[in-house]
């Protein structure tokens, strides 16, 4: 009773106007010493985040792997790394974009069974285009915060080999009467060209961003930085000429090109406009892959003695002009950071999805971000962009990098643009930065 009374007192204090501070309740949640949520173990933490390698669609190592097998591998990895009883998971939410809705929902349910989850654990899908994996993580965090359950998994899945892009069915002719609705149908490459043209992003700037992405991703791979986040997948690959099957274990992203140069990229022709600047070399790759994040209430993690990899702080989704959908992160990031009670300069690392170099460069410049803080291990241009899985992949990459950096890295942001004109961003805090009171075991 005394604890409940004290908690009410703290919450009421946040609701009362103060001459010394106008910080919101969500802002105070970022301050480990001044947070009702932290004090009572009610905030949402991440105890594991895993992904598969990302492989080139149609040509890569997962071209003969079923989507449900990709998802099962990362779901299984979360349980194996934490020894959490699968039956304790309140829900699994999977971000996925291209797979037919009812079929993909069934595939995800099948994947959970492959991974050892009992029939009592529910699963659902969510589709907010390229942010679907991040949306899944945010949905689970919100459900835990609301008290629907204490443990949940936010995941992402895409097989662009199995489910290639393309609009299916007819389009309502009335769409032509509404310019912004009509712009939702623009090819993503055209929106990239629109961003480059409207905001004067040069071809050289875009190509340089691509070179940097490959260079950093190649360095991260060579130094073993991705090993902690990548779950090896045992699968097969089929020779298209002979039909022979070969067993393989996939543990390395296969789209990274270490020898990418400005001169080499300059030779590539624009893909979407004859006089454009968007090429196959400065755009994200079509990829296959999956990722998954295990979240729980802090007091549950403490009771289980689990190390806390990160803390989920805030999430924001915003709308922008569909014709320049790539600007989404430039709007979503400030919204999420403000909700966390922070300034952009307080953020130590950013994972901004490189759908196209044009929009990546624009967002970086618009926000005035330090290039040394962004995509320090490369981005989607080098690693790949399996649409529904990208958010979960970025969360895994961010949190493992924050863990490596330790006390010098407290806050991180994941963000991406979204087809049809949106942006999403989430703020995370490094687990060790607010866990001085936790006596945790190593795994």
From Swiss-Prot:
Q: Does the keyword Lipid metabolism apply?
A: yes
Its assembly, as annotated, is: Homodimer.
Q: Does the keyword GTP-binding apply?
A: no
Write out the similarity annotation: Belongs to the thiolase-like superfamily. Thiolase family.
**CDD domains in the record, alphabetically?**
thiolase
Metabolic or biological pathway, per its Swiss-Prot or TrEMBL entry:
Lipid metabolism; fatty acid metabolism
| Subcellular locations according to the entry | Peroxisome
Transit peptide span, please give it: 1-30
Q: What is its EC number?
A: 2.3.1.16
The GO molecular function terms of this record are: acetyl-CoA C-acyltransferase activity
GO biological process terms, alphabetically, are: fatty acid biosynthetic process; oxylipin biosynthetic process
* A single cellular component GO annotation: peroxisome
- Could you tell me what this protein is called? 3-ketoacyl-CoA thiolase 1, peroxisomal
**Which InterPro entries does the record cross-reference, listed alphabetically?**
Thiolase, Thiolase-like, Thiolase-like_sf_Thiolase, Thiolase_acyl_enz_int_AS, Thiolase_AS, Thiolase_C, Thiolase_CS, Thiolase_N
Catalytic residues (UniProt): 130 (acyl-thioester intermediate), 385 (proton acceptor), 417 (proton acceptor)
Where does the protein principally reside? other
Role: Involved in fatty-acid beta-oxidation prior to gluconeogenesis during germination and subsequent seedling growth. Implicated in jasmonic acid (JA) biosynthesis.
User: Which terms are listed as keywords in the entry?
Assistant: Acyltransferase, Fatty acid biosynthesis, Fatty acid metabolism, Lipid biosynthesis, Lipid metabolism, Oxylipin biosynthesis, Peroxisome, Transferase, Transit peptide
Hey, what tissues is this thing expressed in? Low levels in seedlings and leaves.
Q: Which gene encodes it?
A: KAT1
Q: Which reaction does it catalyse?
A: an acyl-CoA + acetyl-CoA = a 3-oxoacyl-CoA + CoA
Group of enzyme by EC: transferase
Cysteine disulfide links: none
């Amino acid at each position: 009773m005394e604890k409940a009374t004290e908690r009410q007192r703290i919450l009421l204090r946040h609701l009362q106007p103060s001459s010394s501070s106008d910080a919101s309740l969500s802002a105070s949640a970022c301050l480990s010493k001044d947070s009702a949520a932290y004090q009572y173990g009610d905030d949402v933490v991440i105890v594991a985040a895993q992904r598969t390698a990302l492989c080139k669609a149609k040509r890569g190592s997962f071209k003969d792997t079923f989507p449900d097998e990709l998802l099962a591998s990362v779901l299984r990895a979360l349980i194996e790394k934490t020894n959490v009883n699968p039956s304790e998971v309140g829900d699994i939410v999977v971000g996925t974009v291209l797979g037919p809705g009812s079929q993909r929902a069934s595939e995800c349910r099948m994947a959970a069974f492959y991974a050892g989850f009992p029939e009592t654990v529910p699963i659902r899908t969510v589709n907010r285009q390229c942010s679907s994996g991040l949306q899944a993580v945010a949905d689970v965090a919100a459900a835990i915060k609301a008290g629907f359950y204490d443990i949940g998994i936010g995941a992402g899945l895409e097989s662009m080999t199995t489910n290639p892009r393309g609009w299916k069915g007819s389009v309502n002719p009335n769409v032509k009467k509404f310019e912004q609705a009509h712009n939702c149908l623009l090819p993503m490459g055209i929106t990239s060209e629109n961003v480059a043209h409207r905001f004067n992003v040069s071809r050289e700037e875009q190509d340089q961003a691509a070179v940097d992405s490959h260079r950093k991703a190649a360095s991260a791979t060579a130094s073993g930085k991705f090993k902690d986040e990548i779950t090896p997948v045992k699968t097969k690959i089929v020779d298209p000429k002979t039909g022979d099957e070969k067993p393989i274990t996939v543990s390395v992203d296969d789209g990274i090109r270490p020898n990418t140069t400005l001169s080499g990229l300059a030779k590539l022709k624009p893909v979407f406009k004859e006089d454009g600047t968007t090429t196959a070399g400065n755009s994200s790759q079509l990829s296959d892959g999956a990722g998954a994040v295990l979240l729980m209430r802090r007091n549950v993690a403490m009771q289980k003695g689990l190390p806390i990899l990160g803390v989920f702080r805030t999430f924001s989704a915003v709308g922008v002009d569909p014709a320049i959908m790539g600007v989404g992160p430039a709007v979503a990031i400030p919204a999420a950071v403000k909700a966390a009670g922070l300034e952009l300069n307080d953020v130590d690392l950013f994972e901004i999805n490189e759908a196209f170099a044009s929009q990546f460069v624009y967002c970086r410049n618009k926000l005035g971000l330090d290039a040394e803080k962004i995509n320090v291990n490369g981005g989607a241009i080098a690693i790949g962009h399996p649409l529904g899985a990208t958010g979960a992949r970025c969360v895994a990459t961010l949190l493992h990098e924050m863990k490596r950096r330790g006390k010098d890295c407290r806050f991180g942001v994941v963000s991406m643009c979204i087809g049809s004109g949106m942006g999403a961003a989430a703020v995370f805090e490094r687990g060790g930065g607010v866990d001085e009171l936790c006596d945790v075991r190593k795994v």
